[in-house]
Curated annotation (Swiss-Prot):
Residues 62-129 are mitochondrial matrix. This is Mitochondrial inner membrane i-AAA protease complex subunit MGR1. The chain crosses the membrane at residues 45-61, 130-146. Belongs to the MGR1 family.
């Protein structure tokens, strides 16, 4: 365990002449903030500045809207000079500089304080409105540009560079602090269990102190916001070149992946066609060498009803595994017989009415008469 104690600065110490140069962090829509732009991998800082900038743009647009002509909506009944002998109600619009207090003819004696000069003229107000409009539009467009960069880009070269530089700086600080050694006037090491002092020249102690110092440097507020202060970000042209290279490589890999899939599908289709060709040849050979009457003709096949088959599950190993109740409910033979049987039923009436009945009685009488005549002729014969 290392304990840091502040040391005294020597009066003879000279300022360092080679101070690292600070470079403005890159961005697409935060140029307004200049050197305050955070590192590209600091998403919290970027979104904070975008929110503040958007609020500023909305404020300017609100100022542009408020500097326009103000119209006041009043009821006609509030104007005695216009509505003296009537109770008619209606709306009347007027500018705000007209006095809104009306109490009779004495209201026309109210003087309105007016200011003169260029700063209070209509021309200067127009200039202010145009300025607010242009500034608000520019700021909002810049905010939208930065939001598009933060949300739409899947690969951001500035972000990848900032992450890489931050990680390199952390490990470089560890190596630097390790080789610098430990000043006994600033650090003391004690054993965590026994509490006794430990020599600062041990490699384990030097390594632990170097990691602690590098971690403290990385967690510094300035380092968190800007990243390593001495690194120079890549220019906008390099940013576009790397982004274009990434997009080209992405398209190339996607096309290569699709080409592999298409080649695989084409090879499978070729194999399927060859297999179908072999199957057709085998079927043709079997048909050619089959004995007579071994293969039924189409007419014979049509006369044979298809037998309903029961398909069991592939896990069925014994008769006990067969669900007889379910199979009987699905493949009921009586239901199958009803589906396969076609019946034609005709109903004949057993009772005849009206004309048909009388005609039937007449036919019966005629037949009885003919029968009696035939019997009498038979009796007369010897």
């Amino acid at each position: 365990m290392a304990i840091y104690t502040s040391g005294t600065q020597s009066d003879n110490s000279e300022p360092v002449g080679n101070d690292p140069k600070f470079y403005t962090r890159p961005s697409l829509g935060l140029k307004l903030w200049g050197p305050l732009v955070p590192s590209s991998d600091n998403t919290t800082g970027l979104w904070s500045l975008v929110a503040i900038q958007t609020g500023l743009g909305l404020f300017l647009m609100q100022r542009f809207r408020k500097l326009g002509k103000k119209w006041v909506k009043r009821d006609i009944a509030d104007f005695p000079s216009l509505n003296r002998f009537s109770t008619t109600h209606g709306d009347m619009y007027m500018t705000r500089h007209i006095p809104v207090q009306f109490g009779g003819t004495h209201s026309f004696n109210i003087r309105v304080g007016t200011r003169t000069g260029f700063w209070y003229s209509e021309r200067f107000r127009t200039i202010r409105r145009v300025t607010y409009l242009l500034a608000g539009t520019l700021i909002l467009s810049q905010s939208m540009l930065e939001v598009s960069r933060l949300t739409l880009l899947k690969y951001d070269p500035w972000v990848e560079e900032a992450k890489s530089v931050r990680e390199k700086q952390f490990f470089n600080d560890i190596v630097k602090y390790y080789h610098e050694g430990v000043d006994s006037t600033k650090f003391k090491a004690k054993d965590e269990l026994s509490g006794q002092s430990i020599s600062l020249n041990l490699p384990e102690v030097k390594q632990s102190i170097a990691v602690a110092r590098a971690q403290a440097q990385a967690e510094n507020l300035v380092t968190k916001w800007f990243g390593p202060l001495d690194y120079k970000p890549q220019s906008f042209s390099e940013f576009l070149d790397k982004l274009e290279y990434y997009l080209n490589m992405t398209d190339f890999l996607n096309n290569l992946r699709r080409q592999k899939k298409n080649d695989k599908i084409n090879s499978q289709l070729v194999k399927l066609e060859e297999e179908n060709k072999r199957n057709r040849q085998r079927i043709h050979t079997l048909m050619a060498h089959a004995p007579a009457r071994a293969i039924r003709t189409n007419q014979e096949v049509q006369d044979i009803y298809a037998i309903r088959k029961v398909l069991l599950h592939h896990d069925t190993e014994s008769p006990n595994d067969i669900p007889l109740t379910e199979i009987w409910a699905i493949y009921n033979p009586w239901t199958n017989l009803a589906l396969d049987t076609a019946l034609s039923i005709k109903f004949f009436p057993s009772v005849i009415f009206n004309e048909d009945y009388y005609e039937h009685q007449k036919r019966l009488k005629d037949s009885e008469h003919v029968t009696s005549i035939e019997n009498s002729e038979d009796e007369r014969k010897p």
